[in-house]
Structure formats: C-alpha cells, structure tokens
Amino acid sequence: VTLGIGDGANDVPMIQTAHVGVGIHGLEGQQAVNSSDFSIGQFAFLRRLMLVHGRWNYRRLCLLVKYMFYKNAAIVLPQWFFGFRALFSGQALFFDYFYQLYNVAFTALPIIGLGVLDQDVSPKIIESFPVFYRDGLERVFLDRKIFWSWMLEAGIHSVIIFFMVAAAHGEGVWGAGEESTGLGLYEMGTTCLTIVIIFCQIRLFFETSNFTWIMALLYSGSIFLWWMCWITISNWVDLGYLVYGNIDVVARSGPFWLSLIFSCTFCFMITLIRQSTEVMLAPTRSHIGREVMAGHLDGEKLGREQAAAALAEQSQASGFGRARAKSSKEVLTEMLVGGNMVRVSSQKRLAGAQ
C-alpha cells in the first residue's frame, strides 16, 4: 500500500496513482487538495493522520466487515435450520417486511455510529507509542482466523437461538375440533427475529470501546425501532395480514420470554468467555492501551496521566528488555514492541508519581 502526499498541481498524478492520497493546503492552489482522499493544513499533521486516525479507521473498517457478515449469518442460518423442519418446501420463517428491514433499519444504526465514532485507545497513548500502528501491518483486527472465528460464533449463536425457540414453542399440534393453544409459524419467526436483533446489539456492544451517550441512543433506538415496527405492522391488517395481532399473542406467551431470556443468556456467556479468555491469555496492544488509559499499571491503580507518563518514562530509560513470561499482576508491564516488554519497578513508578 502506497501513500502519496503533495501540495501542488504537479503532485496530482502522484496523489491519484497512490492507494491513499493526501493533499496539503498551500500557496500553490487547491488542485492537490481537490484530488486527494484526505487533506491537511500542514505537513506536521501527517503523523496524527496516519498514526491516530489511520489506525482508528482501519480498526473500524475491520469491525464493520466482521459484524456485517456476523449479523447476516445470524439471520440466515435460522431460516436454513427451519428448512429441515419444513422439508425444504420454501416456506419462510420470517415475515417478509421484517426480514427486509433487518439490515437497513433494525441493525444498521449501531454499526454506523461505531464505524464513525469508536476509539479504542486515546490519541495521547497512540502518539506516545507509535508501535500501535503495527496493528495494521500485523493484521491484528482482521485476518482469516479472526473472520472464521466470527462466523463460527454466529453459527453457534444461531443454533442456540433457533433450537431454543423451537423447543419452547413445541410442535403446536392439536386435534380436530380442538381450539389451538400453541403458537404458529410467524409467532415462532418473530420470536426468533426479536432475539437475533437484540443479541446482535449485545454482540456489537462487546466490541464498543468508547461507549458514549450517542452510542447508547443508537443501541436503544434500534431495539425501540423494531418494537415500534412490530406493533405497527401487527395491528395494520392491510399491511401485515399474515401477522395481524401477532404481537398480542407473542408478547403474552411464556415461550417468548423464556426463549428470549435463556437464548440471550447462553449466547452472552459464550461471547463473554471468549472475550475474557482473549484479554487474560493473549491481550492485544489495544487491550493494554485501554488499561493504561484507565490508570492501571502492573496491577496497581494510578491516575490516568500518571500511568501513561510512568510507562513512557520508564520505557525510554530502560530500553526494550527480553520477553519473559507474564503473570496476572504484570499484564500492563508488557511493552508493545514485537512481543518484548519493559519491566517497570512498582517502587520507582510510585515514587515518580508522588
């Protein structure tokens, strides 16, 4: 990947030929700026553009790709599982309008907000340790292994959701002349869809590093939008006659709430165990950077600025020592360069902080 940077008209071919073009506002006109992907006011801003915003955007884009495949697999696989029960007759599990709005409305807002606003590590930490930029070179956020792990997780979640819902609803068979006491096809479908929508928000929440009121509004707004759409269509006979009165039946049924609670709980535990294991056994630079942002260093709680300053000062003074085994109390003494780490004395850090 090449980057071209210039400030004049003679730099336009170079900027357009490079994979990423950066134009600088200068005295030679706006041709370079108008032809570039990014524009900056001074050459000195290039460092922040690449190290901070470049890394943030790379991480957001990788997360966008993983999540888009995840949420589509989560909605498609239950339909595929249902095909075995329907003898592959072509019968859809989900009501058409709900299914079409799944991607464009019910799960779109949070990933858009996260793709624009999320920041895993503060600019000060990134600029203090430029090695964070190696995350892109080493494909820390997206490679084949990570992609297929997300697909495997989507498959496991889909199995839990579909078969939990199917077990809770039962077969719904009754004799001739008897009144139906079971839930029908679209009741099962909307139950399954509700769980998928809610847990997709929960799954993305696990990846949100910078949770703000905007993200909280987008998460809650997506779920609220689904419920409003469900209420509207199930009470509008001309629009959704197949699911007319659907919400009145489903929301009052025990199988709906049981399958919702247990499915989300089991899926949540699987994701939580995976994330916790990754943080404890194989922390990434992003994990360590967030710990430093929180003021934790070598198992001790310092102020945020004190922890970052102590780690930066000691890393410059000590150089890069050879790697050695981590302990649970030494996670944040690991330096972020090539698997090596810097051992920082607790006494020295506390003395310096005081």
Across the structure, where does each feature detected by a protein language model lie?
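Membrane-embedded transport module
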Residues: 1-3, 8, 12, 16-214, ...
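Generic detection of intrinsically disordered/low-complexity segments and helix-coil linkers/edges
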Residues: 96, 126-127, 250-251, 256, ...
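Non-transmembrane, juxtamembrane loop and terminal tail segments
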Residues: 130-133, 267, 271-354
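Extracellular/periplasmic helix-loop-helix junctions in multi-pass membrane proteins
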Residues: 180, 234-257
